[in-house]
């Protein structure tokens, strides 16, 4: 009799992990070739509804486009950006005439009416970002990819056509994100600007949330990094010298003793040789003339201040500790002849 311990396979572990994270009745789990896809009930229901309503709403938009002059299929919202509804194969030549060299499709496969091969035959680059209709927004990664696609074409003078089914929500999300990053607009200003050109645009809550998140992550964070980089260019010692116990040195306080200042003094060797000693911050002058002592003391203080500033400059990466700066004794002999 052999007893064999049963262990879970990797697939069983994966399924059990998914089951632990899925609430009963709230999510549907699809397992295909080892890939586990978790769908919320809301997403599944919206997907079914979107499929059922695609062609009826498409016909509705076509009829309004034919009857109402203000209900345009696409609008030029920027010099190199067209925002509009899903194009038909017959629209591709006209888009090419308008200078379109790139198309961003935010439709799911069942909503796409023009294959990539047709765009390619007209030398039009095609970027597909499949996004569910109505209540959903593209991911942050997809938005960044689309914005870069538009910016790259615009820098080359090429126009990009951004579309979803009706040109209202998903495609508008991409266009607004481009405007806030490359046209220096706030989300509110960009939204109002696009609506002034294409009045029927309308963002769902998730789409507006994606715009605001993109603005904070890609725009405000970039500006913050630029501010930090600018502040980093300011040497630390500039802030340090202006604070603490450091005295700013004034070149005007320096007094230079020249030979003419010494004229008239006794040439006797016993009185002409004066010894000056500087120890720390104290300067002693062995001179009978009080004015001579004052002049030499000012020069000594000026020299001490300049040496202190030079020493602090070498320690720009260290924070001032507030300790007194100590220097060795300096002996200065001034001989008057």
From Swiss-Prot:
GO terms for biological process: phosphatidylglycerol biosynthetic process; root development. Signal peptide: none annotated. Substrate binds at residues 55, 133, 165-170. Pfam families: DSPc. Disruption phenotype: No visible phenotype in the double mutant ptpmt1-1 ptpmt2-1. But plants lacking PTPMT1, PTPMT2 and PGPP1 have strongly shorter roots associated with a defective order of columella cells in the root apices, with stronger effect than in the single mutant pgpp1-1. It catalyses: O-phospho-L-seryl-[protein] + H2O = L-seryl-[protein] + phosphate; O-phospho-L-threonyl-[protein] + H2O = L-threonyl-[protein] + phosphate; O-phospho-L-tyrosyl-[protein] + H2O = L-tyrosyl-[protein] + phosphate; a 1,2-diacyl-sn-glycero-3-phospho-(1'-sn-glycero-3'-phosphate) + H2O = a 1,2-diacyl-sn-glycero-3-phospho-(1'-sn-glycerol) + phosphate. Its EC number is 3.1.3.27, 3.1.3.16, 3.1.3.48. Residues 1-20 are annotated as: Disordered. The gene is PTPMT1. It comes from Arabidopsis thaliana (Mouse-ear cress). SUPFAM superfamilies: (Phosphotyrosine protein) phosphatases II. It comes from the Eukaryota. Exhibits phosphatidylglycerophosphate phosphatase activity. Involved in root growth and columella cells organization. May possess protein phosphatase activity. A motif (Glucan phosphatase signature motif CXAGXGR) lies at residues 164-170. This is Phosphatidylglycerophosphate phosphatase PTPMT1. Residues 73-220 form the Tyrosine-protein phosphatase domain. InterPro entries: Dual-sp_phosphatase_cat-dom, Prot-tyrosine_phosphatase-like, PTPMT1-like, Tyr_Pase_AS, Tyr_Pase_dom, TYR_PHOSPHATASE_DUAL_dom. The active site is at residue 164. Belongs to the protein-tyrosine phosphatase family. Non-receptor class dual specificity subfamily. Pathway: Phospholipid metabolism; phosphatidylglycerol biosynthesis; phosphatidylglycerol from CDP-diacylglycerol: step 2/2. Expressed in stems, roots, flowers, mature seeds and leaves. Keywords: Hydrolase, Lipid biosynthesis, Lipid metabolism, Phospholipid biosynthesis, Phospholipid metabolism, Protein phosphatase. GO terms for molecular function: phosphatidylglycerophosphatase activity; protein serine/threonine phosphatase activity; protein tyrosine phosphatase activity.
């Amino acid at each position: 009799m052999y007893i064999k311990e049963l262990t879970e396979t990797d697939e069983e572990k994966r399924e059990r992990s998914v089951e632990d994270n899925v609430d009963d009745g709230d999510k549907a789990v699809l397992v295909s070739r080892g890939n586990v896809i978790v769908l919320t009930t809301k997403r599944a229901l919206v997907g079914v509804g979107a499929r059922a309503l695609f062609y009826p709403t498409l016909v509705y938009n076509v009829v309004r486009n034919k009857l109402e002059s203000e209900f345009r299929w696409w609008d030029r919202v920027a010099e190199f950006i067209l925002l509009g509804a899903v194009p038909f194969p017959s629209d591709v030549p006209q888009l090419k005439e308008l200078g379109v060299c790139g198309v961003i499709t935010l439709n799911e496969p069942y909503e796409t009416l023009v294959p990539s091969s047709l765009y390619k035959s007209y030398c039009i680059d095609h970027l597909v970002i499949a996004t569910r209709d109505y209540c959903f927004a593209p991911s942050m990664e997809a938005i960044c990819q689309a914005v870069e696609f538009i910016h790259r074409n615009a820098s080359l003078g090429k126009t990009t056509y951004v579309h979803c089914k009706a040109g209202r929500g998903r495609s508008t999300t991409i266009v607004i994100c481009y405007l806030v990053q490359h046209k220096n607009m706030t989300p509110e200003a960009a939204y109002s600007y696009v609506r002034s050109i294409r009045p029927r645009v309308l963002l769902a809550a998730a789409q507006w949330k994606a715009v605001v998140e993109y603005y904070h992550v890609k725009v405000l964070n970039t500006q913050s990094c630029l501010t930090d980089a600018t502040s980093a260019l300011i040497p630390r010692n500039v802030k340090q010298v202006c604070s603490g116990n450091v005295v700013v040195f004034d070149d005007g306080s320096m007094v230079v003793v020249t030979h003419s200042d010494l004229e008239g003094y006794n040439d006797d060797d016993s009185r002409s040789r004066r010894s000056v000693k500087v120890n720390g911050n104290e300067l002693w002058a062995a001179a009978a003339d009080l004015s001579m002592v004052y002049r030499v003391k000012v020069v000594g203080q000026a020299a001490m201040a300049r040496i202190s500033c030079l020493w602090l400059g070498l320690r720009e990466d260290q924070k001032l500790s507030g300790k007194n700066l100590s220097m060795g004794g300096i002996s200065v002999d001034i001989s008057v002849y």
